[in-house]
Amino acid sequence: MTDQQSTGLTGNTELTDKQSAELSAEGVPQDALRRLAELRPGRPGGIFTSDLSVNEFLLVREAGFRPLGLVLGSSIYHVGLQVGRWGKNQELDVLSQAMYHARELAMTRMEAEADALGADGIVGVRLDVEMKEFGNDIAEFIAVGTAVKAEPGAGGGGVSDWRNNKRQPFTSDLSGQDFWTLIRAGYAPLGMVMGSCVYHVAHQKFGSKIGNIGKNVEIEQFTQALYDARELAMSRMQAEAEALHAEGIVGVQLRQHSHTWGSHTTEFFAIGTAVRPLRPDHIIERPTMVLTLDA
């Protein structure tokens, strides 16, 4: 994701010409600029918007963070063409790069909106892909979440900067409940990290198919293909976390989608939230045992 300096200006309830120009350069439309100007903190009669549930909202507030507004990024992307060899396991790097770049565009635009609000981070992020009717090779990549600002004393106090080492608002796909638990445990999110690999799985030879009829047998080329593809996605996600100087990644999800490529071409996508300890001597609180009286 592109490095960007903080553009939120304390006490200023309007977007400056410079801020508007920077957002436009990121691909944020004019309608979004007007909406963001109305959401800026300190504006008389201003409100916040959020896709958090009531429980999530209350727990995020309890953790010491104030919602500023719903932020989003979108990219409608034409995914190029690459054909795998019939009998060979291989990554389709043109498609891998397309899927990765499109998601990066959506995430960067969402981060730019949060930055314009002066947010410290974005919680409850959803990153989705929707295939469109414009064509089988056109998809919309959407990132949406709630921009938040840390209140004094958030995280137990003593934390002066909640942004990551790239000077961007942190991003997290954790639920409001998990975010509260993470902060209480003495950790902070750095950013969502991800890895993508589009992989072509070789077709079996006709003789092998015939020979396996009626047998319990491992299809080794399929096993190796799926193993390799997942490892590539995971290693790329881990590399992003290392670039953020993270201690670890929580809430990892490993997804598999064929999209419109057919049964032998699949995207393996790994995503999670990179985290860091808030202080070197942090202590994880012991969980409280709760016994229900329900029958």
Model-derived features: positions:
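Short, conserved loop-to-beta-strand elements that form functional interface hotspots
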Residues: 121-133, 248-260, 282-291
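Short, well-ordered alpha-helical segments
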Residues: 71, 76, 85-126, 207-253
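Short amphipathic alpha-helical surface micro-motifs
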Residues: 48-56, 105-106, 124-126, 170-177, ...
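C-terminal functional regions that serve as terminal interaction/effector modules
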Residues: 217-220, 239-248, 252-283
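Hydrophobic, ordered structural segments
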Residues: 102-156
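Intrinsic disorder/low-complexity detector
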Residues: 2-95, 138-222, 273-295
